[in-house]
Regions:
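Repetitive helical segments and hydrophobic/amphipathic motifs
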Residues: 11-12
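A beta-strand edge to alpha-helix "cap/lid" segment located at domain peripheries
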Residues: 4-7, 19-59, 63-155
């Protein structure tokens, strides 16, 4: 009886340690993914400001779709074309209150964005909320979707 109890306690202890290590590894992995997404988003911002086709092509997934604050829908091809033609240009983009949720091979990024730029000659809405969806494809994180909503002033 005593031997069975000792074996059971040892088994539970080993299981608890293993679960703790797995949760710690999972937390570390999430943190690593969050850092990678933040870095990629910073690269995306710089690529948009500089109309860097190579970086935009690397960051955006081939099936990307984006919805701007005015409701304009753009594919990856349209995004790259609009940046390279000058139809869409930014002088500055900053983000704040960024949160990233990681789900295995997908991540959802939300936050506030302040943009100074023009879309076909018209000023883009300056203050927006955004949602971006990132998916790990062939070992790399790629942006598959984003959506902007104009921020409504609080009363």
């Amino acid at each position: 009886m005593r031997r069975t109890l000792v074996i059971a306690v040892l088994g539970l202890t080993a299981t608890s340690i293993a679960l703790g290590q797995k949760q710690s590894a999972s937390r570390n992995q999430r943190s690593s993914v969050e850092q990678a997404i933040r870095q990629l988003d910073n690269e995306r911002i710089q690529a948009q400001i500089g109309a860097d086709v190579v970086a935009l092509d690397r960051i955006y997934a081939d099936d990307f779709v984006g919805v701007g604050p005015s409701g304009t829908v753009r594919t990856k091809t349209q995004v790259i074309s609009d940046f390279t033609s000058g139809a869409l240009k930014f002088q500055s983009i900053t983000t704040d209150e960024v949160q990233i949720r990681v789900y295995e091979n997908a991540a959802v990024e939300t936050g506030l964005s302040t943009m100074v730029g023009q879309d076909k000659g018209k000023a883009v809405p300056r203050d927006t909320r955004f949602t971006r969806v990132w998916v790990k494809q062939q070992g790399r994180w790629r942006l598959v979707a984003n959506h902007y909503s104009s921020q409504i002033p609080q009363h």
